[in-house]
Amino acid sequence: MEVLYSLSKTLKNARDKIVEGTLYSNVSDLIQQFNQMIVTMNGNDFQTGGIGNLPIRNWTFDFGLLGTTLLNLDANYVETARTTIEYFIDFIDNVCMDEMARESQRNGVAPQSEALRKLAGIKFKRINFNNSSEYIENWNLQNRRQRTGFVFHKPNIFPYSASFTLNRSQPMHDNLMGTMWLNAGSEIQVAGFDYSCALNAPANIQQFEHIVQLRRALTTATITLLPDAERFSFPRVINSADGATTWFFNPIILRPNNVEVEFLLNGQIINTYQARFGTIIARNFDTIRLSFQLMRPPNMTPAVNALFPQAQPFQHHATVGLTLRIESAVCESVLADANETLLANVTAVRQEYAIPVGPVFPPGMNWTELITNYSPSREDNLQRVFTVASIRSMLIK
C-alpha cells in the first residue's frame, strides 16, 4: 500500500511540475525520484481486472530514463515524460479499481488484488518515498493491529433512523404524547410533543428522553447542540405504528426546559451538559442520552391560551425539540464522511463495473446497513478500500 501511495504521489508531482519551460534545476530531485521509480518497475509484468465487468489488462514496464539538461525542459523532453506518466497513471488507476472491487472475510485489511500483492514485494520497497497520508499511516497501524485514529468532519456515524414512540395514545389519535426523531449521518433531531400541552401532567411538565448508541466510539468530538428540531416544526400526516391509519401532527414550538445531554462510554458517564447550547465538547463516548422537558406556560396571553385549551379538541400540538450535530471527531475505525468522496468513489467503481455482491459488503454499499452491522471484517475491508480510494483520488478526480 505504501508503494502504491508513493507511486501516485510521484506521478502527481511529475504531472504537475514537469512542464515545458521549467528549469531542470527546479525539478532535478523529482526527476531522480521518477527515474528510480522507472528502474524499479522496468522488467515487471502485472495483470489487473477480471472481476465483474472490470476488463483484464496486462501491464509491461520497459521505459527509458529521463535525462539531464542544463537549461529549461523543452517540448520533446516533456512529451517523453508525459508518455511515461500517462501509462503509469493508467496502471495505478486500474490497480486501485481492482482493489476496490475485492473483499475478503479474513484479513480484509491486506491487499486482495494480484497486482497490489505483487507491489508489496521486497523489490519494490525502493519506491517507498513518502507515506505521510493519514490513511496510509492508519492502514499501517490497522495492519499491525495497533490503535488507529482518523479525524472526521461530519462523520456518518448514525445509521438512518426515523420513527416515533407514543407514551399516550388512543384509537382516535386525537390526544397523543410522545417523541419522534430522525438520526442520520452526523446529526440527531428529536422532538417531544403533547397534544394537551402537559395539561394533566405532574406540575404541568412532560419529561422526554432519547438515547442513541453509536456503532463505534468517538473521541475529542466538537458538537453543536441547539434547542430546536426544525425537521419537526411543520404539520405532517404520520402513519400509525400498526399501519392501519394515519394521524395529524400540527406542532406549535416551545423552548425545551431542563435540557441535559450525557455522553457515556461502556455505560459510564464521561461528560454531562445541562442547559448549555452552542458548541460543546465530548471527550470519549459510545452512547448519547438526551433528556428535556415540555412545560405548560404558567402565564399565557389570550392568543397563546387559545392555542392550548383546557379540553379537547386539541388542534395545535405543543412541541419541544433538540438538534445535536457532530462537527468533527476522532474515531479508531474508518467511517464515511460527508466532507470526503471516498465512499462515493468506491461505490461508483463497484456499480460501474457490476461487481458482484461478496461476503462482506452489502448490496450497493448501503451505508446504513453497513454501519448498523459494522463487523471487524467490514472494518478491515473498508479500511483497505478507503485507503486505496484516497490514493486514487490524488490522480483521478
UniProtKB/Swiss-Prot annotation:
Binding site for Ca(2+): N266, D286
Keyword Metal-binding: yes
Subcellular location: Virion
Keywords: Calcium, Capsid protein, Intermediate capsid protein, Metal-binding, Ubl conjugation, Virion, Zinc
Residues involved in Zn(2+) binding: H153
This protein's GO CC annotations: viral envelope; viral intermediate capsid
Pfam families cross-referenced by the UniProt entry: Rota_Capsid_VP6
Post-translational modification: The N-terminus is blocked. Sumoylated with SUMO1 and SUMO2. Sumoylation of viral proteins seems to have a positive role on viral replication.
Single GO molecular function: host cell surface receptor binding
Region described as Interaction with the inner capsid protein VP2: spans on this chain: 62-73
Family per similarity comment: Belongs to the rotavirus VP6 family.
Additional record remark: The VP6 trimer contains a zinc ion located at the center of the molecule. The zinc ion is not essential for either trimerization or transcription activity of the DLP. Zinc-depleted VP6 has an increased sensitivity to proteases.
General function of this protein: Intermediate capsid protein that self assembles to form an icosahedral capsid with a T=13 symmetry, which consists of 230 trimers of VP6, with channels at each of its five-fold vertices. This capsid constitutes the middle concentric layer of the viral mature particle. The innermost VP2 capsid and the intermediate VP6 capsid remain intact following cell entry to protect the dsRNA from degradation and to prevent unfavorable antiviral responses in the host cell during all the replication cycle of the virus.
Subunit composition and interactions: Homotrimer. Interacts with the inner capsid protein VP2. Interacts with the outer capsid glycoprotein VP7. Interacts with the outer capsid protein VP5*.
This protein's name: Intermediate capsid protein VP6
Protein's organism: Rotavirus A (strain RVA/Human/United States/P/1974/G3P1A[8])
